[in-house]
């Protein structure tokens, strides 16, 4: 049986520096995720760090995106090999790794997604990702079709951005603006000049190493500015934010 994930088109688009517009999925529901998948976004983040997701909620969302052109990207709760292994086995190929501060942490993330000898991923011969053992070339194709995006969101991460971006197997650098703002002493104010300067610096250093950069920017003016600065993969909103804003606007229309 053929696996319709290989080759990984999202990974190829990033390597070609093609702009990829995405959206955040935080409602942890297959219906809302399916709606996002019909909208035409290039990629969707299914959030395992701040949203109430786990293996049991991720699988229905992956099923809901089966016919979608939007590439599912999972943000893992932490850079931990067993967690990453389990998410690989259920069918994720694109990973966003939060709070990466050093080259060694970036290398660990890459190794966690690769079978030996390139990495340390544990081997199961039958799981959802290989269609329960029916994809003949899964082991041969898997290592080279995994996308690793590492998230820089601390001063140490900024300081080590060159080493992180140069790490073999890292496909892109993603900025976490809220945590970065907090780390720089500007909690709740990612628009502060110090934070914006750091974001642009990260983009520039990623580009210097031939790596695409990305960010979450639910405000249109911010998203367009980051694209002008050279960001390649930008998430321009979230299902939770869209839902909250639209419902509030509807209520206000009739209640005020």
Curated annotation (Swiss-Prot):
Required co-factors: Mg(2+)
Cofactor note: Binds 1 Mg(2+) ion per subunit.
UniProt pathway: Carbohydrate acid metabolism; galactarate degradation; D-glycerate from galactarate: step 2/3
Annotated positions for site Increases basicity of active site His: 89
Enzyme kind, highest EC tier: lyase
SUBUNIT field: Homohexamer; trimer of dimers.
Protein name (database record): 5-keto-4-deoxy-D-glucarate aldolase
């Amino acid at each position: 049986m053929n696996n319709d994930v290989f080759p990984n088109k999202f990974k190829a688009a990033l390597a070609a520096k093609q702009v990829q517009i995405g959206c955040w999925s935080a409602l942890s529901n297959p219906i809302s995720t399916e709606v996002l998948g019909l909208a035409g976004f290039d990629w969707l983040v299914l959030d395992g760090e701040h949203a109430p997701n786990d293996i049991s909620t991720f699988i229905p969302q992956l099923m809901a995106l089966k016919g979608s052109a939007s590439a599912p990207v999972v943000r893992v709760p932490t850079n931990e090999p067993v967690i990453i292994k389990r998410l690989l086995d259920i069918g994720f190929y694109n990973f966003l790794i939060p709070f990466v501060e050093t080259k060694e942490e970036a290398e660990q993330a890459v190794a966690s997604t690769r079978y030996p000898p390139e990495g340390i991923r544990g081997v199961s011969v039958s799981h959802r990702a290989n269609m329960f053992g029916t994809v003949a070339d899964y082991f041969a194709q898997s290592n080279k079709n995994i996308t690793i995006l590492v998230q820089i969101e601390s001063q140490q991460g900024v300081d080590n951005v060159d080493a992180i971006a140069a790490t073999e197997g890292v496909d892109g650098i993603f900025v976490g603006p809220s945590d970065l703002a907090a780390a720089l002493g500007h909690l709740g104010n990612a628009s502060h000049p110090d934070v914006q300067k750091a974001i642009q610096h990260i983009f520039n250093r990623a580009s210097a190493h031939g790596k695409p950069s990305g960010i979450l920017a639910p405000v249109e003016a911010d998203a367009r500015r980051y694209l002008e600065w050279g960001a390649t993969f930008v998430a321009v909103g979230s299902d939770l934010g869209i839902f909250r804003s639209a419902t509030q606007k509807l209520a206000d229309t009739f209640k005020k």
